[in-house]
């Protein structure tokens, strides 16, 4: 049984972390498969949105510390080897996400801890089941947030709260995560995937070029001034107004029907 299951539902690609007996602790196979799935979905015109969730009653409990301990007992790696392994193995999904141009959603069921919380944070947004719990638990095992926690968390909840959560490793339940802006919606556990997939499908049904441009422009705007952002939007606007999908949207509006977008 593979450590990651993939399913296509309409225009949504669903990736399910699949080590439920280990609370979906990350394995090298899982990270390999997920990073490859992201690259493939980004190139597939039939995919409009990507959703990550976990099998069983957990989203992801972080890295597989048991497996890591056995490997280190067999051979103690040098500091350089540790650094290179972190970059090439543990961080490969974060690097794939950085290049992913389509909408990316985390559907958090149960616990998201350490690298599991980081995986949720690196998505464009998160929705949660009522039983979801989040913890940057690295501090409890003497580690640093190695998969983007120091980068993503302050941008979502602000620096003071991020530092508190990183320093303490405290758990945040679903309602508190909603209050902090860590998740956009909290659904009953039994409805999490149905409602997440409905939302993902609504997004995926949008015009593909415009979806990608909105994501790119919104992220770029976090690192530039207003004038530069407006100029960039203007340049992209000139392009999208020449697309068939723009013309289809205007025609559908006039005809009072749902537009059919083709990504061109």
In which residue ranges do the predicted regions lie?
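Glycine- (often His-adjacent) and acidic-residue-rich active-site loop
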Residues: 54-96, 112, 225
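Crotonase-fold acyl-CoA enzyme core
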Residues: 95-211, 238, 242-251, 257, ...
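Terminal peptide-recognition signature
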Residues: 15, 19, 34, 52, ...
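Conserved CoA-thioester-binding segment of acyl-CoA-metabolizing enzymes
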Residues: 1-55, 71
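Charged catalytic carboxylate motif
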Residues: 29-33, 89, 96, 195, ...
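Short, charged, surface-exposed hinge/linker loops at domain edges
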Residues: 215-224
């Amino acid at each position: 049984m593979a450590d990651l299951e993939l399913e296509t539902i309409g225009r949504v690609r669903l990736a399910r972390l699949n080590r439920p007996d280990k609370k979906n602790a990350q394995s090298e196979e899982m990270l390999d498969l997920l990073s490859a799935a992201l690259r493939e979905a980004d190139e597939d015109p039939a995919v409009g949105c990507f959703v990550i969730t976990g099998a069983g009653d957990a989203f992801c409990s972080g890295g597989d510390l048991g497996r890591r301990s056995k490997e280190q007992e067999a051979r103690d790696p040098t500091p350089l080897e540790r650094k290179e392994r972190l970059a090439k193995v543990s961080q490969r999904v974060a690097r794939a996400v950085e290049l992913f141009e389509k909408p990316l959603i985390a559907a958090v069921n149960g616990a998201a801890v350490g690298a599991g919380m980081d995986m949720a944070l690196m998505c464009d947004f998160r929705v949660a089941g009522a039983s979801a719990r989040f913890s940057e638990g690295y501090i409890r095992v003497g580690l640093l947030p190695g998969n983007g926690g120091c980068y993503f968390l302050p941008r979502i909840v602000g620096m003071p709260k991020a530092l508190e959560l990183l320093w303490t490793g405290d758990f945040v339940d679903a309602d508190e995560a909603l209050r902090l802006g860590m998740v956009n919606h909290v659904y009953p556990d039994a409805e999490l995937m149905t409602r997440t997939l409905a939302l993902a499908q609504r997004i995926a049904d949008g015009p593909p070029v415009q979806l990608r441009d909105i994501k790119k422009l919104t992220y770029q705007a976090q690192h530039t001034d207003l004038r530069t952002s407006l100029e960039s939007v203007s340049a992209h606007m000139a392009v999208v107004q020449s697309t068939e999908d723009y013309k289809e949207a205007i025609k559908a509006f006039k005809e009072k029907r749902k537009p059919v977008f083709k990504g061109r």
